[in-house]
């Protein structure tokens, strides 16, 4: 059978009708296009029918929404009062308060945390992928040079690290691995290894499900509509933390620095002390 451009467009259109996201279809396009290009080079076909067919097929990406302050407070209170999920509270507070990527969070070691000066040094991240030794964690540099940064701790984050140290001692969650020459990881499983990113998103999903189950039952008893928590991921916590900074009038350049997204042109704290002051004020919250 000769593959034609119309066949590919029909295929993508069918996937779109099935509700697949544009990003998913784009991924398929990225697999098909070079494969057919190779067939052209080998003389199997004369023309690549896939090239230029991506278009805007598929559902657009949903805009990621941050939790409101009320939702954030309710969620953290629920976790704090839960015997099942309370051990996850410090990690969530760090991600909310420091606006860290999940890879940066699980890659934190105790040597990265300066409790005296209340700063977090972010200089790398842990990524999980298949290498020569199979699937395992790899120490990686941050996505950009901007990812290397020192983040002032809020009071919530400072207390979270203190609590996590207590939990590690109480439950024996000590890091027993060395990855890329780094050791002493803060957030670990019961086996002494860093928590996987999928594991973080898994317990966040379970927390929201448990919260909504409790809220639905309470709303039924009080004869009102339940105020359910939306689905969240590790990125939601980071995005929410950034939103809180904006609500506290932190300078956009300082926000970019904290998020690890600032552009070249000098350290933002060196040119805008008001931004640093706002971060310091935010510490007490």
PLM region spans:
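DNA breakage-rejoining catalytic core of tyrosine-based enzymes
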Residues: 1, 45-47, 58-77, 123, ...
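N-terminal core-binding DNA-recognition domain of tyrosine site-specific recombinases/integrases
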Residues: 1-44, 61, 83-84, 194-199, ...
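Long, amphipathic, Lys/Arg-enriched alpha-helical "connector/arm" segment
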Residues: 6, 17, 59-87, 97-100, ...
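Short, basic (Lys/Arg/His-rich) helix/loop patches that form interaction surfaces
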Residues: 18, 22, 77-88, 98, ...
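Short, charged hinge/linker segments at domain and secondary-structure junctions
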Residues: 37-62, 220, 225
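Short, charged phosphate-coordinating catalytic segments
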Residues: 37-48, 95-126, 253-254
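Catalytic-site neighborhood detector that most strongly recognizes the C-terminal catalytic loop/helix
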Residues: 58-59, 66, 126, 259-284
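C-terminal secondary-structure termini that scaffold catalytic or DNA-interacting sites
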Residues: 117, 128-148, 155-157, 218-224, ...
């Amino acid at each position: 059978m000769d593959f034609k451009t119309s066949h590919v467009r029909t295929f993508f259109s069918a996937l779109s009708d099935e509700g697949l996201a544009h990003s998913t279809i784009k991924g398929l396009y990225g697999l098909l296009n070079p494969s057919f290009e190779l067939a052209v080079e080998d003389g199997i076909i004369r023309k690549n029918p896939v090239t230029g067919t991506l278009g805007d097929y598929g559902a657009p990406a949903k805009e990621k929404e941050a939790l409101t302050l009320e939702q954030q407070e309710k969620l953290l209170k629920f976790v704090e009062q839960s015997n099942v999920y309370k051990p996850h509270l410090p990690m969530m507070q760090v991600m909310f308060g420091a606006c860290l990527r999940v890879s940066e969070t699980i890659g934190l070691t105790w040597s990265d945390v300066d409790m005296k000066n209340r700063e977090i040094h972010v200089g790398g991240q842990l990524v999980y992928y298949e290498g020569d030794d199979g699937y395992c964690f790899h120490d990686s540099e941050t996505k950009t040079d901007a990812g290397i940064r020192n983040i002032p701790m809020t009071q919530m984050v400072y207390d979270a690290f203190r609590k996590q140290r207590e939990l590690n001692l109480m439950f024996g969650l000590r890091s027993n691995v060395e990855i890329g020459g780094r050791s002493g990881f803060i957030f670990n499983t019961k086996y002494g290894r860093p928590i996987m990113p999928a594991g973080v998103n898994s317990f966040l999903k379970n927390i929201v499900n448990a919260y909504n189950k409790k809220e639905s039952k309470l709303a039924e008893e009080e004869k009102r509509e339940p105020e359910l928590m939306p689905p969240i991921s590790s990125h939601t916590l980071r995005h929410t933390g950034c939103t809180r900074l904006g609500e506290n009038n932190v300078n956009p350049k300082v926000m970019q620095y904290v998020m690890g997204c600032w552009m070249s042109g000098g350290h933002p704290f060196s040119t805008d002390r008001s931004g640093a002051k706002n971060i310091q004020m935010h510490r007490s919250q």
